[in-house]
């Protein structure tokens, strides 16, 4: 039958003029259906994928438990190392203090503190080993509880999440805290055993040094310290008109030395000889001036023989000048044949100098010895005898206004100074020898403590695997109802698996944890007395754990700075320098204090790092899932059983934290704890088993069968 052309055009969906109204409506309906279908698919996928976020959160929560445990391990390591360093450093400071008589009481306390800190280190090592092992064994439960708690906390709007975490590796060997090296114990015992001998040697050296110090002070006063009163410097300026360059003045005995006095005397006599003049024109005045010149010439020659040698030892020669006639007779002044001789009658006459009126026409010369050996006449003009020359020295030696008086006191003091140093040298030398050996022992012991550290490879050290499931009923079109897409039933169970591993976080948090340790002891009144001396050292030793050798050097310097090192013998300063030098060569390396933070990774990476049956099963399941996607649900039947066996443990009670160990020093105690996840308070081991059962039930509801392990 033929259709009229007009009617055919009315029912056409396409013509040369475009689409009809019916065609447009159909196209719009198809487009809207596709849009809403795509949106529905996206929503279903989005809702389903939330379980992966929960699995990730559970893995991170479980990883945080392991990270917290590693903080405790590092704290225990820092305590063990710092207590060893504190013990050895305190012992070294005690040895230094024993070298100073005024600090020997402090030295005894420091030596005792060193021994008691070592005992505390031994006690801490035992409790830390037990405590860390106990917490390590609880890590699987703690991690599982934390993951399960996070999963439950995310349940809302119809979602019902369950998660179970497994640590890789799932177990670890007990943690051992190494005991100190035998060298450290031997070094402390030797220091304590030889302390009394070092004290006695230091006392003898100090007594000798004090005598030497007193002699030097007296010499300084007689040389220039008494200025503007009478002294060598004042007399040299007044009598010989010496310049400041020839006649220096020192304000402190510490800056002065015996060589200053000797050089002053060596410059004085030539200068004094150059300015010597008779008091008047009388024969007696001229004779006395001539004899003074004779004495000054002799004195200049004698003093020029003097020397002062200072360095490791002291040696000096201050030639003594005659102070009276008897002493003059023992010098070359008495034997010098330099005086003119005149003969009047049968007896010769000796004259003081060539200018004597009675010496005119003399043809020979003789000495005072010659005069006293024969029956010689005394000159009626100059009256020259041996006593005349003896009085020249006596006049300036016996009273304080004479240069020779002060020079003689310096010469005597130099002899006393040298004698005292020589008497103290053996004791000082022996003390240095003993202290050097003891400090070398402590240095060697400090060098070895770095090898006795605490290390751990706990469960979860390589990573965490978390299984999560959402069994809550959730309509496919919930919140997105539409007439374009018809939805019925509920979304099925959504499952996911995630993994996390620990990575370093250089944020400085690890350093803060270590630094806060000392605060507990620093404020504890139980540390007063003996152990108070070691508290500051321990703070420095903790810094050495973080910063290495530089902090150890600073701790030693600070400890030395608090000691009473002032001593005449100088043993205290020497021992302090020796201690610093010895510990400077220890070569302590800083520990890695980067905090650990969990980060999500591919589960294969974690599984490959473990060698347990669970890891092998997980890798095999992942391989099969890739090869046979439809069998991927077997991950739960294969894995959950292993998790359940490894995690399920029963604990009687939990608090906010677990105590790993306690630092106990002389009554002061600082606990080292591991914070527990909040979930542990109300999350018993039964909940872990229930979570595993629920996961297996999910698998049964999907596959129609239940596998029992």
Task: Cite the ranges covered by each PLM segment.
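Long, compositionally biased low-complexity segments
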Residues: 78-346, 385-709
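Alpha-helical assembly-interface signal, strongest on the long, hydrophobic N-terminal helix that forms
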Residues: 2-92
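Generic low-polarity alpha-helical segments
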Residues: 1-11, 58, 347-351, 355-356, ...
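Mature, structured domains enriched in cysteine- and short glycine motifs
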Residues: 334-390
